[in-house]
Amino acid sequence: MAIITTDSDYYTHRYEVIIPFVVSTIDCIVGIIGNGFITVIYGTELVRSKRLPTGEHLMLMLSFSRLLLQIWIMVEITYQLFFPMIYNHNAMYKLFKTISVFLNYCNLWFAAWLNVFYCLKIVNFAHPLFLMMKQKIVVLMPRLMSLSVLVSISLSSFFSKDIFNVYMNTSVPIPFSNSTKMKYFFKTNVLNLAFLYYMGIFIPLFMFIMAAILLITSLKRHTLNMESSTTGSRDSSMEAHLGAIKSTSYSLILYIINALALFISMSNIFGAYSTWNSVCSFILTAYPAGQSVHLILRNPGLRRAWRRFQHHVRLYLKR
C-alpha cells in the first residue's frame, strides 16, 4: 500500500499565503464572471421559453458546473490558507476533497457530452450504429446527463473513506529553541486515489478522444472528396470540422493538464504552501476561467451577448 505523508506548519510566512491567494482570486473572479455570464444567458432563455436546444442546454449545465467548481475552489483555498484549523479537521478535509472530485467529474462528463453532440451533428458516417446515435442523441441526452451526475456522485463518495487522513501534533520541537509548534500531517493512500480518480475520468476522456478521432477522420475523407470533385477550396462543412477539431483538442489538452494538477494536489506530494502546490492551485483555478472565455469567443450568440453586456456596463459607469 503506497502511503504519502506530508506536513504543514500552522504558522507560515505571510507571502506564502497572500501571493497564492491573490493569484487564485484573480483566476476565480474571471471564471465566475465568464461562467456566470453563460449560465445567466442560457438560464434566462430557459425560463423564458421553457426549453433549450440540446447544445445550449449542455452549455448551460457545463457552465453551471464550472461556476460551482470555481466557487468551491475559492472557498477551499480561503479555508486552506486562512482557516487551517477548520480546513485540516479530518472530516472537513475529506468533505472539501470529495466535493471537488464530484464537481470535476461533472465538469468532464458535460464537456465530453457537448463534444460528442457536436461531433454527431457535423460528422457523417454510414455505419448503422452511428446513424442510430445521430438520430437518438437529442432524446437520450437528458437521461445521459442525469446518469453522468449519478455516476459522479457514486464514484466521488469513495473519496470520503480511506484515502485521506489528517492529524495534528501540537508539540513539534523547534530546532535550536526550547519552544514547540503546531503541525498538520496528511496521509494519502496514493494507490487507491489513483485507481478511483482515473477510473472516474476514463470513460469521458475516452469519449473526448473518440470524438476527436471521428472528426479528424471525417475531415480527411471530406477533403479527399473535395480534391477529387472541385478545386479543393474550403466550404462550410470543412470550416465546421476544423472549428470542432480545434475546440475538442483545446478542451482535451486543458482537461488533461487540469486532471494531473488535481491529482498532484490531492495526493499531497508537495507541502501545502510549496511552490508546486501553488502552481497546481493556479492551474485548477485557471482551467474553468479559460474554458469560459473559450466558450464565449467561439459562440457567435454569446459574443454578441457579451458585447451588449460590456455596452451596458460602460453606460452604467458613465452615470
Curated annotation (Swiss-Prot):
Residue ranges annotated as transmembrane are 18-38, 67-87, 99-119, 137-157, 196-216, 252-272, 277-297
Q: Where in the cell is it found?
A: Membrane
The record's keywords, sorted A to Z, are:
G-protein coupled receptor, Glycoprotein, Membrane, Receptor, Sensory transduction, Taste, Transducer, Transmembrane, Transmembrane helix
- Report the GO terms under cellular component: membrane
Q: Which residues are glycosylated?
A: N169, N178
Per the record, membrane topology reads: Multi-pass membrane protein
Q: Which N-terminal stretch is annotated as signal sequence?
A: none
| Residue spans, topological domain Cytoplasmic | 39-66, 120-136, 217-251, 298-319
A single GO BP term for this record reads:
detection of chemical stimulus involved in sensory perception of bitter taste
Main location class: membrane
User: Between which residues do disulfide bridges form?
Assistant: none
Against SUPFAM superfamilies, the record matches this protein to: Family A G protein-coupled receptor-like
Which residues face the membrane's Extracellular side? 1-17, 88-98, 158-195, 273-276
Q: Name one GO molecular function term.
A: bitter taste receptor activity
Which family, according to UniProt?
A: Belongs to the G-protein coupled receptor T2R family.
What further fact does the record state?
A: Several bitter taste receptors are expressed in a single taste receptor cell.
Family matches, as PANTHER family:
TASTE RECEPTOR TYPE 2, TASTE RECEPTOR TYPE 2 MEMBER 40
Q: What is this protein called?
A: Taste receptor type 2 member 40
Source organism:
Rattus norvegicus (Rat)
The record's gene field reads: Tas2r40
